[in-house]
Amino acid sequence: MAYERNVDSRQPPELHLISALLALESTGYLISLAKQCGGGVITEEIQRLLLNYCITIFSSSDFPNTLPIRNLAKSLINEVESSGGVVLDEIYELCSSLMTSPLESSGSKSQRVLKRYSFLFPDTTTLMIPLISSTNMLEGDTGCSVWPASLYLSEFILSFPKLFENKSCFEVIYS
């Protein structure tokens, strides 16, 4: 018997899946969350949810880097097919169009991605913070996006905004 439930991108676990997708988490993690949403398998409803977000969010991004979508589409097809499920035709079409289009050039615009970090509050408030990041490790950035303590600090600041009202934040640079 198939696992059936209503898919709502504003409620957990779908909300967690979409938040991870917007933050460009690894495909393995996204597949794991997608399976949680579907009760152990990636249902057609979850595939459609992922497809809609891939097309609407990443296709209209200010920094269109198709590599994350490409990797997710391939992993999604592989996972659904290996579990004996049915892959949506639209996902095959998306994957084939991404596979036949050339990779972005090495220009600076294509080497940037727009990650969106979501902070989810118990009162259903969601705060999304966009972060433009380089895909080139040699180009560098602050590193705060991958530093776990920065996430905890951000959550603390968002939980107690009065403590940080009219305060400034700066980065210490050692030379």
PLM regions: where:
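S-adenosylmethionine-dependent methyltransferases
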Residues: 1-175
